[in-house]
Amino acid sequence: MPPKTRAAGAKKVRRKEKKNVAHGHAHIKSTFNNTIVSITDPTGNVISWASAGHVGFKGSRKSTPFAAQMAAENAARKAQEHGMRKVDVFVKGPGSGRETAIRSLQAAGLEVGAIQDVTPTPHNGCRPPKRRRV
């Protein structure tokens, strides 16, 4: 019988290492249902992230511009703890929280450099969902 290494239920805790990154990228994915803000270093390693659901909004309130603002502020605050000062913004998706998230990154104290729209557009790929009839 192999010897037990850890007590039952004990988890191995991984410490967060303090990275010191002055310049990075902010990726804002804004869908119709949620907004996700990820702040990475220039190579793409995630330093901090937040989403409207992670900040505490549920259901249809996740898709509001205010929820996107709160998520961007939360991610910016965490990134500033790692020494982040300047970001280039990449926005993806058709959601309502795009502009609000960019403004709140600036308001949180991050200097916004370039803003780029990287929304994927199909070259007539999959059939889109049917139109809503209300």
Curated annotation (Swiss-Prot):
GO MF term set: rRNA binding; structural constituent of ribosome
SUPFAM superfamilies, per the entry: Translational machinery components (SSF53137)
Keyword line: Ribonucleoprotein, Ribosomal protein, RNA-binding, rRNA-binding
Record-linked NCBIfam families: PRK05309.1, uS11_bact
Subunit-structure text: Part of the 30S ribosomal subunit. Interacts with proteins S7 and S18. Binds to IF-3.
Family per similarity comment: Belongs to the universal ribosomal protein uS11 family.
Name of the protein this chain belongs to: Small ribosomal subunit protein uS11
Gene name in the database record: rpsK
